[in-house]
Amino acid sequence: MKPLVGVIMGSISDWEYMKKAVEVLKEFGVPHEVKVVSAHRTPELMYEYAKTARERGIEVIIAGAGGSAHLPGMTASMTTLPVIGVPIPTKNLGGVDSLYSIVQMPAGIPVATVAIGNATNAGLLAVRILSIKYPEYAKKLDEYTEKLKEKVAKMNEELQKEVENGI
């Protein structure tokens, strides 16, 4: 099956974070592709990737970048597909620089931005976007939400036992 989600990152060093999005996509059975596409080192590749994504069957792009973090915004400027930006943590500023770069897009070029390093939510957001068109993903999201509820209930149950037993 053709990939529905494109996961791109500016450098292989971003993979440490971006693989979390891929894990989510695999969990939900979403066909995807993963590539290193640098806005600064390979601008032609970035341009080609964004311009051909729709015709290749891609419906959502998840783009992770650190530092100046131009990849998500530049990708969004070249396609009308939804682009989800993942700010990658950096050594000097902890990823705040990446966050500001991705979230401060000019009017007309939206990038949905998740928390610094939170590619898990980027993957989940991509699945939610796809669930509008694909009912099987909506069903899996409902099941995922139920599992989260069960997990919280179990945590609360364990907490109550600990409190009752005198911390």
From Swiss-Prot:
Cysteines joined through disulfide linkages: none
Entry keywords, A to Z: Isomerase, Purine biosynthesis
Pathway recorded for this protein: Purine metabolism; IMP biosynthesis via de novo pathway; 5-amino-1-(5-phospho-D-ribosyl)imidazole-4-carboxylate from 5-amino-1-(5-phospho-D-ribosyl)imidazole (N5-CAIR route): step 2/2
One MF term in the entry's GO annotations: 5-(carboxyamino)imidazole ribonucleotide mutase activity
Enzyme class per UniProt: isomerase
Keyword Isomerase: yes
Coiled-coil regions, chain positions: none
EC code(s) of this entry: 5.4.99.18
Stored InterPro entries: PurE_ClassI, PurE_dom, PurE_prokaryotes
Reactions the enzyme catalyzes: 5-carboxyamino-1-(5-phospho-D-ribosyl)imidazole + H(+) = 5-amino-1-(5-phospho-D-ribosyl)imidazole-4-carboxylate
Stretches that traverse the bilayer: none
Gene Ontology biological-process annotations: 'de novo' IMP biosynthetic process
Its job: Catalyzes the conversion of N5-carboxyaminoimidazole ribonucleotide (N5-CAIR) to 4-carboxy-5-aminoimidazole ribonucleotide (CAIR).
Protein family according to the UniProt entry: Belongs to the AIR carboxylase family. Class I subfamily.
Protein name per UniProt: N5-carboxyaminoimidazole ribonucleotide mutase
Organism of origin: Aquifex aeolicus (strain VF5)
The organism's taxonomic lineage, starting at the top: Bacteria, Pseudomonadati, Aquificota, Aquificia, Aquificales
Record gene name: purE
